[in-house]
Structures are given as structure tokens and as C-alpha cells.
Swiss-Prot record:
This is Cytochrome c-type biogenesis protein CcmE. The keyword rRNA-binding does not apply. It comes from Rickettsia prowazekii (strain Madrid E). The lineage of its organism: Bacteria, Pseudomonadati, Pseudomonadota, Alphaproteobacteria, Rickettsiales. Residues 1-8 are cytoplasmic. It comes from the Bacteria.
């Protein structure tokens, strides 16, 4: 009888340790996705040298077209501003006052974006 209880206890402990290990691996791999994006005022909390997502509203009168497909603009969270440099095709919803998420790296005081995601507003309008 003692041997059966001991074997069952060992199996339970192995299952528990396996579950803990699996959950730890999942959380470790999801670490960079737990915070979807940083606002400009919290960008200093982000880990430097890694790819980041930063989000905010495109500040009015800040869009500066440098060349045919290179642009700079400023995003804000109404606390702090951050200059974004982007080279590529702009999303269709990109405009002043619109929310965006930029994916890239922080370089000095500028953010070099490799991808832009334009956020739409939360108001639903059915097609007419």
C-alpha cells in the first residue's frame, strides 16, 4: 500500500513541476508582448537596444516629408512628445490627430520606425 501512495505522490509532483515549467516558458516567451506599446511619456521605462512599440497621437502640424518615401513626425500622449522617423509606405489611415503604433528602435531622442500601424477610432459606422 505504501508503494502505491508513494508512486502516486511522485507522479503528482512530476505533473505539478511540468505544469510550472510549461507556464514559465510561456510567460518568458510572451514577455515582450505583455505591454503592447509604450506611450511617449513611458518610453524611458522600456529596455534600450531592443525592438519597441510606441504609440500615441500624431501631433498636428508635425508631419515633415523628407523624401518620396521618408517622413518624420511627432507623436504625443499629451504629456511628452517623441519624434518618429519612418521610411516606407504610409498606412491609409495615417493623418494628423490619428492614433498610431510605431515598431522600431529608440536612437538618441528619436525613434526609428520600421513599421507603422494606424489605429482607427472606436466609433462604428455601418456601410451605407
Amino acid at each position: 500500500m505504501q508503494k502505491i501512495v508513494r508512486n502516486r505522490l511522485i507522479k503528482i509532483i512530476i505533473c505539478f513541476c511540468s505544469a510550472c515549467l510549461g507556464i514559465s516558458i510561456i510567460l518568458y516567451n510572451l514577455e515582450k508582448n505583455i505591454i503592447f506599446f509604450f506611450p511617449p511619456s513611458k518610453i524611458n521605462e522600456a529596455e534600450q537596444g531592443k525592438e519597441l512599440r510606441v504609440g500615441g497621437l500624431v501631433k498636428r502640424d508635425s508631419i515633415n516629408k523628407i523624401s518620396a518615401n521618408k517622413i518624420s513626425f511627432v507623436i504625443t500622449d499629451n504629456i511628452k512628445d517623441l519624434e518618429i522617423l519612418y521610411q516606407g509606405v504610409l498606412p491609409a489611415l495615417f493623418r494628423e490627430g490619428q492614433g498610431i503604433i510605431a515598431i522600431g528602435q529608440l536612437s538618441d531622442s528619436k525613434f526609428i520606425a520600421r513599421q507603422l500601424l494606424a489605429k482607427h477610432d472606436e466609433n462604428y459606422r455601418p456601410p451605407s
